[in-house]
Amino acid sequence: MERAPPDGLMNASGALAGEAAAAAGGARTFSAAWTAVLAALMALLIVATVLGNALVMLAFVADSSLRTQNNFFLLNLAISDFLVGVFCIPLYVPYVLTGRWTFGRGLCKLWLVVDYLLCTSSVFNIVLISYDRFLSVTRAVSYRAQQGDTRRAVRKMVLVWVLAFLLYGPAILSWEYLSGGSSIPEGHCYAEFFYNWYFLITASTLEFFTPFLSVTFFNLSIYLNIQRRTRLRLDGGAREAGPDPLPEAQSSPPQPPPGCWGCWPKGQGESMPLHRYGVGEAGPGAEAGEAALGGGSGAAASPTSSSGSSSRGTERPRSLKRGSKPSASSASLEKRMKMVSQSITQRFRLSRDKKVAKSLAIIVSIFGLCWAPYTLLMIIRAACHGHCVPDYWYETSFWLLWANSAVNPVLYPLCHYSFRRAFTKLLCPQKLKVQPHSSLEHCWK
């Protein structure tokens, strides 16, 4: 994030500054009352950011069911937000209250690199989370096949950090050497390229506009996919967004009913031995084998029928034909059961995907609300060299970025049952043991 020289960034607002006045060297002071109020609000934001994201990380330790590929990306986001609360905000509080950076030029460089890195990685993590959920809805089969590949997820997480550093890190560290010297006044801490409009518009395109358009595309694609599947289900279509499993189910041989050992054909044109049903008793699978073979009676004769008399030869086929009706009805029943099972599975997946879309829409909306004001004001401010945007509006805009780090942990339990259960396991373990389902409502009311 671009750090402005905080000359009068609160003093520009009389309502906020009160009796504040700029001191020599760009320093400023607030009235004791306003200093206490601002310090309390900033401390509250720090506590909320640190505790909320620490709870997310502890949830991964306490609940192994959370360690899925998508949730690893949420963990990566929580790590970024946690470090914002631990390192970035605390160092900025005295700077914004006094108007002077008192920690030296070296720590200023480190703070800028880390701050830009963490904020950018948060954005890239949101893109990664959105893309992962896009795949889970639109390419469900291949996505489920990759769920156990944690190394793949770790590689993506590392790539996010590398790209986030490359966007701003080299520029922060080398700009003053490439330009022939530093332009930052003593007692201030902000990036050398703060007023370079061309660099900022390029970086903003990569940091905000492209990610925001990407997550909007993923969210819209998920919505359209769900709408299409909902129409298919309402119209009586029994297919998911993908290959129809019904032809395969119809072409496969029926499976034996539960508790009926050996009474179903092994395959097309193959019957089971009749001696499994007892002497002189025809099993219901024999006629299925005969039907597949063209109705011949010799192969289906009982081993006990060694005389080959004509009476037995004519009676056996009649008994098999009488038994053919239960076999056909059983196959039809099983087909209907499979169709019902597929319909239930489709409804479950559709309901799950709708929840994914809703949670993703919430996260994306919060992301846009927190990042859009800062990005737009930063570009406008750089274009007019800081003279057309009041400092307090710019200051408020990048505090919204840090507020996003505190809000993200709240979005997880609101949008994900698995996180609600993990948080309950940490915060209300006794209620979870007594009432594992209803306790969630008591803990979060």
UniProtKB/Swiss-Prot annotation:
Chain segments carrying region Disordered: 236-264, 288-336
Disulfide bonds, paired cysteine numbers: 108-189
Organism expressing this protein natively: Cavia porcellus
Name used for this protein in its record: Histamine H3 receptor
InterPro entries according to UniProt: 7tmA_HRH3, GPCR_Rhodpsn, GPCR_Rhodpsn_7TM, Histamine_H3_rcpt
Organs and tissues of expression: Expressed widely and abundantly throughout the brain. Highly expressed in discrete neuronal populations such as pyramidal cells in cerebral cortex or cerebellar Purkinje cells.
GO cellular component terms listed in the entry, alphabetical order: dendrite; plasma membrane; synapse
Extracellular side of membrane: 1-40, 93-109, 179-197, 381-398
Similarity comment: Belongs to the G-protein coupled receptor 1 family.
GO biological process assignments: adenylate cyclase-inhibiting G protein-coupled acetylcholine receptor signaling pathway; G protein-coupled receptor signaling pathway, coupled to cyclic nucleotide second messenger
Modification sites for Phosphoserine: 439
Protein keywords: Cell membrane, Disulfide bond, G-protein coupled receptor, Glycoprotein, Membrane, Phosphoprotein, Receptor, Transducer, Transmembrane, Transmembrane helix
Presence of keyword Glycoprotein: yes
GO MF term set: G protein-coupled acetylcholine receptor activity; G protein-coupled serotonin receptor activity; histamine receptor activity
Stretches with biased composition (Low complexity): 299-312
